[in-house]
Swiss-Prot record:
<feature type="compositionally biased region" description="Basic and acidic residues">
    <location>
        <begin position="269"/>
        <end position="279"/>
    </location>
</feature>
<keyword id="KW-0206">Cytoskeleton</keyword>
<dbReference type="GO" id="GO:0005856">
    <property type="term" value="C:cytoskeleton"/>
</dbReference>
<dbReference type="InterPro" id="IPR028457">
    <property type="entry name" value="ABI"/>
</dbReference>
<keyword id="KW-0963">Cytoplasm</keyword>
<comment type="function">
    <text>Involved in regulation of actin and microtubule organization. Part of a WAVE complex that activates the Arp2/3 complex.</text>
</comment>
<feature type="compositionally biased region" description="Low complexity">
    <location>
        <begin position="183"/>
        <end position="199"/>
    </location>
</feature>
<dbReference type="GO" id="GO:0005737">
    <property type="term" value="C:cytoplasm"/>
</dbReference>
<comment type="similarity">
    <text>Belongs to the ABI family.</text>
</comment>
<feature type="region of interest" description="Disordered">
    <location>
        <begin position="173"/>
        <end position="287"/>
    </location>
</feature>
<feature type="compositionally biased region" description="Polar residues">
    <location>
        <begin position="230"/>
        <end position="251"/>
    </location>
</feature>
<protein>
    <recommendedName>
        <fullName>Protein ABIL2</fullName>
    </recommendedName>
</protein>
<comment type="subunit">
    <text>Binds SCAR.</text>
</comment>
Length: 312
């Protein structure tokens, strides 16, 4: 109801304004005829009447009023025309604004529909899945270097054949590259291992003089293993001891509990060193045995012999 009432009021106002505008235009048209008739009347009265001064003054007053009315009519008509034009321009601009709002809403609806359609299509589309494969250049064989150069573009091998092929290739590379030797003891020396062919030279140490034996005992080739509290220091100490007979001395070295456990290769080298030491000590044993036999039948005239043996 209020919308229809406003519409009716708007129509009534517009009709009144249009009627006033038409009346103003009609008055302007009638004003021309009135001015012409008034001019003819004053012309006749000026020629026939004796009182010409009164006729002239009356003509002046009428002309001024007619001019004022004409200007008033022209101003009112101009105002009405401008008001009508402004009103129509406002209506046109308002209509354009409404049309632009409707177009914007349509664009937003279209974009939203396109977005929803793409999202639904992305959920429906089933993307193809390809198997991940290792591609080698022509003429190359899978080795350890080639395995490092391969680029893997997936997280898992889905095909069973590909997985078996890859596993066989890895096994082949593992068989080709032997594992490095594992050290059994961390306390083992970093010196080069004693070659086995030198063990044959120990059988001839009994015929070598004592000075040459002392010189060779310092050689690193003869005693390759050097450790804290090592065998080399104990062997040098045993060589520097005087050759006096002692029952408590034994050939086998004493093994201390704090000494780390040695590997099998170290034991073999140590046994060879013990064998060499026993061979070096054989002349001194025979010397001590001879001295012990002579000491039982010691006389004053044998003192020179004992001193000679001690010096020897």
């Amino acid at each position: 109801m209020p919308a229809s009432h406003e519409a009716s009021n708007y129509d009534e106002v517009s009709m009144q304004q249009s009627m006033l505008f038409s009346d103003g235009l009609q008055d302007l048209k009638n004003l021309r005829a009135q001015l012409y008739s008034a001019a003819e009347y004053f012309e006749l009265s000026y020629t026939t009447d004796d009182k010409k001064q009164i006729v002239v003054e009356t003509l002046k007053d009428y002309a001024v009023k007619a001019l004022v009315n004409t200007v008033d009519h022209l101003g009112s008509v101009t105002y009405k025309v401008n008001d009508f034009i402004d009103e129509k321009v406002d209506e046109v601009s308002e209509t354009e604004l409404r049309v632009s709002c409707i177009e914007q809403r349509l664009r937003m609806c279209q974009e939203y529909m396109d977005h929803e359609g793409r999202s639904q299509q992305s959920l429906v589309i089933d993307t193809p899945k390809f198997h991940k494969r290792y591609i080698l250049p022509a003429g190359e064989i899978m080795t350890a270097t080639n395995l490092e150069k391969l680029k893997y573009f997936g997280s898992s091998l889905e095909d069973a054949d590909d997985w078996n092929q890859f596993r066989n290739a890895v096994r082949a590379t593992i068989r080709e590259t032997p594992p490095p030797p594992v050290r059994k003891s961390t306390s083992q020396s970093s010196s080069p291992r004693q070659p086995p062919q030198r063990s044959a030279t120990f059988s001839f140490t009994s015929t070598i003089p004592k000075k040459e034996q002392d010189k060779r005992s310092v050689s690193p080739h003869r005693f390759p293993l050097l450790r804290s509290g090592s065998v080399a220091t104990r062997k040098s100490a045993s060589i520097s001891r005087p050759t006096t007979p002692s029952k408590s001395r034994s050939i086998t070295p004493i093994r201390y509990p704090s000494e780390p456990r040695r590997s099998a290769s170290v034991r073999v080298a140590f046994e060879k060193d013990n064998q060499k030491e026993t061979e070096q000590q054989q002349p001194s044993k025979s010397k001590r045995l001879l001295k012990a036999l002579l000491s039982r039948r010691k006389t004053k005239k044998d003192d020179t012999l004992y001193t000679f043996l001690d010096e020897y």
